[in-house]
């Protein structure tokens, strides 16, 4: 919304970061998922279990999606982990009601091996929503942008993280 952006800027707000958000109907995402099983198992985790995995990210999550926000959300969010030989190789935090993916990240050494696809597949099975949404992805994030595009999850819009210096 260009008009709203101009109003915020006229009030002294500055853009810190630009974020993309992606959406797709759940069934269309399923059609893009491989039936070839990855060499990982998907397990339920607690939000604290992903503290050691923050290095998996290619960008720092927005304040709405950071670990503190995830902890505050409590049971409204589900955290799944992908384990390869008992080692956490990736994780996904999402809302089963809304279909919003708050965070999805894979250790760079395990990328392109089906880990994120396995997490996405399990998330889709657990969500009640007919829509999958990935929100607040810093622009650009080539690895996540390409992964989502390969699964048919389309860019739906852009948002800004803004700050007002007092």
Where would I find each of the regions flagged by the language model?
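A short, internal acetyl-CoA/4′-phosphopantetheine-binding micro-motif in the GNAT/acyltransferase core
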Residues: 104-112, 138
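Conserved active-site alpha-helix within GNAT-family acetyltransferase domains
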Residues: 1-17, 117, 138-158
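Conserved acetyl-CoA pyrophosphate-binding loop and the N-cap/start of the following alpha-helix
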Residues: 110, 114-122
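Amide-forming acyltransferase catalytic core, primarily the GNAT-like/NAT-type
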Residues: 11-93
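Conserved GNAT acetyl-CoA-binding A-motif
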Residues: 19, 127-140
